[in-house]
């Protein structure tokens, strides 16, 4: 984590960007890693834990390869966390629904953080332009 943070700080100082941009860049990196891990968890739960038809069976994904399942699960995770949530894939078992609740909470928090960071970047940029 420390090396990634140093990398973001070096990038920010090289590009003459503020701390808000560094935080936002680090946040995007963490969000992408989170989508990967939750996507893998979503596959694991769909294939192993279930008291009935999982999202894999209910969506007709039984014959998909592991890479196709990874793509579908990462798509689901990304659309849920970014609050787009098309609804074409959803949790059907209790465990899957609990994971969806967790993803919804992460989505609200990440959306709020991203909005605040972008507002800070724009405000700092505007104040820097006013000084020049």
Ranges and model annotations:
Residues 1-2, 22-39, 60-131:
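Pore domain of cation channels
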Residues 8-11, 46-61, 127-131:
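Interhelical loop segments of eukaryotic multi-pass membrane proteins
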Residues 1, 7-20:
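A conserved hydrophobic secondary-structure block that centers on an alpha-helix together
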């Amino acid at each position: 984590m420390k090396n990634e943070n140093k990398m973001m700080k070096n990038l920010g100082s090289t590009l003459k960007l503020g701390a808000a941009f560094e935080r936002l860049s680090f946040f995007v990196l963490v969000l992408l890693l989170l989508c990967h891990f939750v996507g893998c968890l979503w596959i694991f739960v769909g294939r192993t834990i279930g008291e009935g038809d999982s999202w894999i069976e209910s969506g007709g994904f039984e014959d998909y390869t592991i890479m196709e399942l990874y793509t579908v699960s990462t798509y689901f995770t990304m659309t849920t966390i970014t609050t787009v949530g098309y609804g074409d894939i959803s949790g059907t078992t209790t465990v899957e629904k609990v994971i969806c609740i967790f993803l919804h909470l992460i989505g609200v928090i990440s959306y709020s953080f991203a909005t605040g960071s972008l507002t800070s970047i724009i405000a700092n940029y505007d104040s820097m332009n006013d000084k020049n």
